[in-house]
Structures are given as structure tokens and as C-alpha cells.
Amino acid sequence: TKTKKIIKNIKVNWKGSTGIHTHDNMGKALENSIEAINNSVNWIDCTVTGMGRGPGNTKTEYLILELKRKNEKSEKLVHLLNLIKNYFEPLKDKYKWGSNPFYYFAGLNSIHPSFVQGMLGDDSFQPEDIYSNLNYLSTVGGKKFSDELISLGKNFYKKVIKGSWKPVNLIKDK
């Protein structure tokens, strides 16, 4: 896998401890973290419910369940599950973090996740607007984030006209 190749290349010249921090844009954060464990990475960066910017990171609770399958200790899992239910889920609902189809589409098309984050945080963007803008970004290139590109998409749907050229001026006085 790509994760295995990256770890192998790092370990050629680095003999110290290694770790991994994965994002969940395409739903592979856990898979890549497990692959890292299987390739002797020393630490895995994870967050409760995957809390993080945009689609988030490897979910601690999922990683614990995977490690439990490998006979690792996980006696504190019930405490973590209660913490999630009572504190993290309400925050997740309030601040709307986590994976969704828009982040996945962005990942498939090498679009910077800040585009998705910006549109999701703006109530004037409806799902069809977000999807249409992401389709546009997939054709013009969205690897580098730009507020201007989000504004263009927003203005397109709001019918805000920018510029001074008017076709009526071409036929005026004729």
C-alpha cells in the first residue's frame, strides 16, 4: 500500500521513533493507521470521534476496537463511549465536523478541504450549490485554497453581477 511504501522509505534513513497522523477525507484514516501499526510505527495520532478540522482524523474509539481485536488492552473503552455520548456527540452536532460526501468528493478530486469547510460553514450554500462548486473546482483545479473561488461560486448562485460590460451597449445608437 501507499502507506507501507511511505513508512518503508522513511525508515531507510530514519532510525528513531515514527508516528502517523491521518485525515479521514476518503474514509481511510483508520485503515492507514492500522497499516502503520502493522509496519512498526511507534505512535498513532487519533482523536475522540475523529474530532478535527474538516473530515477529521482517525477515531480513537475505532482504533481501540481494532486494537482489541489484536488482544491489546481496552478496559477503558466504556468510559470513552460515555464521554462520547455525553460530551463529544453534542459538540459534533453543534460544530458539524466529520466526514461527509463533500469531503470525500474533494479527496477524490484533489480539492483542498478548506473549500468544503468554508461552504459548509456558510448557510447560504445549499447541498446542490456545494456539489456544483466542487464539480467546478474539479475542472479548474482546487488544490490551493482561495476565498475568491468560494465567492465566485456564491455570487453565481446569488446572481451577483461583477463587472461593467453590458451587451446592450453594443447595439445602443444603432
Task: Name what the model sees in each region.
Residues 1-174:
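Catalytic cores and adjacent flexible loops of soluble metabolic enzymes
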